[in-house]
Amino acid sequence: MKKNNWIYIWLISLSVLLGIYFLSDDGFYSVPKNVVTKEIINTKPENLSSQYKPSIDINNQKSPEDLQNGYEESIAVVLPIPGEPPISLWRPPLYPTPWAISPNDHFYFSRPIAADEINWPLANYRYGYFFPDSDIIHTGIDITARRGTPVIAAAPGTVIWAGVGLYYGTYNEEDPYGMAVTIEHDFGHKDKKLLTVYGHMDRIDVEEGQRVETGTQLGIVGNTGFSTGPHLHFEVRLETNSYFRTRNPELWLSPPQGWGVLVGQLKNIDSQFINLKEVYIRNIETKQSWMVLTYASNNINRDEYYKENLVLSDLPAGEYTLSFSNDAVTYKYDFNIYPGAISFISFHERTGFSSELPPLLSPKEWDNIILTDDFLP
């Protein structure tokens, strides 16, 4: 009998130790609900412990009647329960703006969502993609955020639009942007004005003609206009406040410190852009992976220098492999991402890959670029 008692005591002690372990900082962590696997992969392992805390079932308590009636239950290990999305996964602070290592770069804008929130592009709604089940081109990036999250100015300037009707240029409750703000900034690029757009807000906190600084609250994230859920639609426009004058915001938003941006140009054997192609990026050292689509159409505004059809920002500096398949052939190319810089890759189905930069445009060539109210080919 005594021997059996010692066995019971030993088993109970072991259960207690296991319970303590599984609820400790070294134990299991709950993965927040709706966090994409890619984002988990892109988080440094040593930082996961600060992001995902132990899950403890505080509701698993017994009433006094249960205790008086001799209610007994073995110590249970509480499995993680999906929680709310984290405020932000680990990311370094941004480079100060304006930031440009080369004369071809123009990281002039800070993020329109503060650093304590998710403030990077939603992977499935990048610039140049088609809206789902349509042939309408997405002319900005979408940043997922909780409803009510402050939307802030990406750079100093003057509010030239605040309200509903941005696309039509006049009040229209059916406007796809919903409640939106446009800022004309104090600076330009190549003697052309720069503007930024903030769409789908639930509330606007500024008015037309108002002066704003970097970080001024413009309103709050919402779900107005053509939107399937709360998020911020952000655009960069060149010269005029027109849907047809957009550029890829990922080439204009300052990257996190120590991180860089991949810019690509993929063409087929006929020298035509390869559209809507899945391109995979893999960090050789950490094995982290990303997938980005090339632009959906030839009729999309590209950077005047890079003439890209692929952009993937916020990549930690390091060695990478790019791969994609076309006409049953898989192509691979190793390249480097450098801190605070753009890494350019071109591919032609006839000649293969190259990391050689495009030739510089002369001032005369820049002046000859035609700006029309239609997408440039």
Where are these regions (language model features)?
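Hydrophobic single-pass membrane-insertion segments
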Residues: 20-34
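Surface-exposed, glycine-biased beta-strand/turn segments
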Residues: 45-179, 186-188, 214, 227, ...
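Short histidine-centered loop motifs in beta-beta connectors
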Residues: 146-148, 152, 189-215
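Short, acidic Ser/Thr/Gly-rich low-complexity loop/linker segments typical of extracellular
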Residues: 285-309
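Hydrophobic core positions of the immunoglobulin-like beta-sandwich fold
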Residues: 198, 312-313
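N-terminal Sec-pathway targeting helices
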Residues: 1-13
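A residue-level detector for short acidic-glycine micro-motifs
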Residues: 161, 200-203, 220-223, 268
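Conserved, short, structured surface segments that act as functional micro-motifs
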Residues: 171-185, 208-259
